[in-house]
Amino acid sequence: AWASGINLYAAILVLGLLGSSGNMTLPPDLQILTHPVVLMAAGFMYFVEFFADKTPGVDTSWDVLHTFIRIPAGAALAAGAVGDVDPAISLSAALIGGTLTAGVHATKAGGRVLINASPEPFSNWGASLAEDVGVVAGLLTALHYPWIFLGLLVVFLIVMIWLLPRIWRGVRRLTQMIANFFRARRPPGAHGEETEARLPPPQLPEAGKDKNSY
């Protein structure tokens, strides 16, 4: 679920390859990840995401689209990871996994919006490559050193909870700055606004002249 919030297709591809090569025994509900068709689909989508995720602007659109893909997929992977257990446990795992995926996804997407505000493209590429490496390294660590992975995951969650509100405050300020910029450039009378007619100032009666009597 953690990896799904960062790069879903890389997570599926790595898990599928580890399962099909015998380096990892997947739970029965996740054995489908080793199917060649699933591996090819995950590999193709990872290839597309590799370039989309490193293109400023495109990466944000990609993240918005995958809000509706990563979170349900993360919940499904978490439910499948617990194996054949009581349905209540599977549902609980899905809820926790979906929430974790949503938090990671929101942190990634919000951070990318702020990074895209930078005029140079290298920070975008660096962040994307770090995410790719982090997903693979995290899954391998979970496989070989599960307790170390759990400790790192707890640290990651603490940092995410601390960082997420600050990221979205930054996104809100950036959005407000962009809105103010276009509002300042808007010509008078735009969007159907009517300019008020300027009326001449009222004439005061001249001194020394009598008022008309009734």
Residue ranges and their predicted role:
Residues 1, 47-60, 109-116:
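C-terminal ends of transmembrane helices
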Residues 184-214:
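Long, low-complexity, intrinsically disordered cytosolic termini of multi-pass membrane proteins
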Residues 72-81, 86, 90-111, 133:
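Mid-bilayer segments of alpha-helical transmembrane spans in multi-pass integral membrane proteins
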Residues 60-72, 94, 119, 123-125:
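Cytoplasmic-side transmembrane-helix entry/capping segments in multi-pass membrane proteins
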